[in-house]
Amino acid sequence: MKESPLITLVKRHSETHFANIKYGYYVLIISLVYLIGLALLRAFGRRTPSRSSSAFKNKIIYRLYDIDPAIHLGILFFAVLIPFYYHYSLTTQSTVYLKRLGRLSYALIPLNLFLTLRPNWFLRKNCTYTDFIPFHKWFSRIITVIGLLHGIFFIIKWAIDDNVSLKQKLILKTFNFVGFIISILVLFLLICSIGPMRRYNYRLFYIVHNLVNVAFILLTPIHSRPGVKFPFLLLNCTLLFIHIINRIVFAKSLMILNKNANYSKTNLVHVRLPRAILPDYFEPGSHIRISPYRRINPLYWLLPSHPYTIASLAEDNSIDLIIKETSTAEPGSQIESLRSNPKSFHLDQEKTYTLINSYPPSVPEECYSQGTNIAIICGGSGISFALPLFRHFFNKENVKYLKMIWLIKNYSEYELVLDYLKTNGLTFEKKPSNNKRISVFISGEYTAETRLDEITTNIDDENSEYEMGSFNNEDEDLSISNFNSENADSNDKTPETSHSPTKENGSLIEVKSKHSFTLSNELKSFNNESAQVNQNETWLFSCGPPSLLQLSKKYCNDERINFVCETYGL
């Protein structure tokens, strides 16, 4: 009898080949749980510092509600990494964990893309996209580093293994070569994202950031084994498509109606846009994003747009912007510098721009409805955020105390805003009150309450560098420490005593030059009033350079006061 030949079947893959599939699904589930938890936190959480709780507990609660990257990323990665090391030996089956790093980086991308949607309908009621900018920056960096480590560790593993040809593994195998290309792109992105590089040429960083992200999303499924096409590639492509649709559907063309500028005195300018570009209602302190290119222009997609806070209220007849246009020139030659400086962006009446969309401020709804004791502190072009808030609360009958403090470098900035108020007929004459006032400080003497002499304006304002050169201005050199007599402009003819410069607003606006500025002194009445009202009725807003925000935030933490801020700086 003839014996049948023995057929030996050889496994195509080792027993660990599919070891990471379930882990990828686990990461996706954790991402979903995090989103649900985030929505619940913002809907029912408390950002108000309790007067009965310790300062440490209040700080943790505030950082948790404020989506502090250290807190939120710590929680997220603690959950993600719990089952990372499981079942397989790290010494004999290290390949499992090297592959797991790659799958982890790709499985986290859907969460990152989802949190940067604008608008984000799932979180729209209690969050704005600006809330996620610090989180997005650090989350993106971690995802990038994890993916890069995946590639580096494999190269090291093959290089030290005498039984493996590095060239054969890395170059001649198509799947691995694609991964090698991804690693090079990711490394280039990390180099461009280093602070000095990013600030030196933000446009380059932004272009590289977008192109590498798209390449990472599309090339990884070619490289990955086993595949990640479903559900990860499908989710990532869907979210990318939504990002693109948002930039098409909500965009509209606009023309500048008027521009009031005097570059020989100040870079602060007033720009007027048509009222029809925005919906009938928008919240005070909202901002818009403008691109100098049309939607059919590739540069519309490759280069960053520019955000501008709206200085108007919804009931106004036009949309007004009060902005600072970046310049490196000396006074008298500013306009030439603005036109030649590649880092600057300025709005011209003769050009057509694209309004990408309008976005609400990061201000809780209860602040608008319940706030009765309000203080607003701003520096430079931060007046564009502060002024509509002041007008909103000024018109409310139930507001018991309202004060706005504006810190500027020269009197010309005040003149421009005063002209804006006159042009729009905003005299605040209807409801005069001793408890409602605007104080303008012009580079006067400053008595430090905290060690702000150690705070420089070179602090990297990370919120403003995501997807834009942010609020184009030069307020970063408006440090609180500049409010002393040595820094006063010798050409400034502002009197040294307090005065009310206009008849229309004589009982409301006071200008102070060469005066010492201490926040506690300026807010004595505000602080006294806070002890007489419910905690959710007292709010302090701050907008300006980092040193001003730090001072305001510390004051609120010490006094257990609700704090809302918007950062202007580069």
Curated annotation (Swiss-Prot):
It is found in: Membrane. Residues 101-219 form the Ferric oxidoreductase domain. Keywords: Electron transport, FAD, Flavoprotein, Ion transport, Membrane, NADP, Oxidoreductase, Transmembrane, Transmembrane helix, Transport. It is an enzyme of class 1 (oxidoreductase). One of its GO terms (cellular component) is plasma membrane. GO terms for biological process: reductive iron assimilation. It is a multi-pass membrane protein. Residues 480-507 are annotated as: Disordered. Pfam families: FAD_binding_8, Ferric_reduct, NAD_binding_6. Its EC number is 1.16.1.-. Probable cell surface metalloreductase. May be involved in iron or copper homeostasis. PANTHER family: METALLOREDUCTASE AIM14-RELATED, NADPH OXIDASE. This is Probable metalloreductase AIM14. It comes from Saccharomyces cerevisiae (strain JAY291) (Baker's yeast). The gene is AIM14.
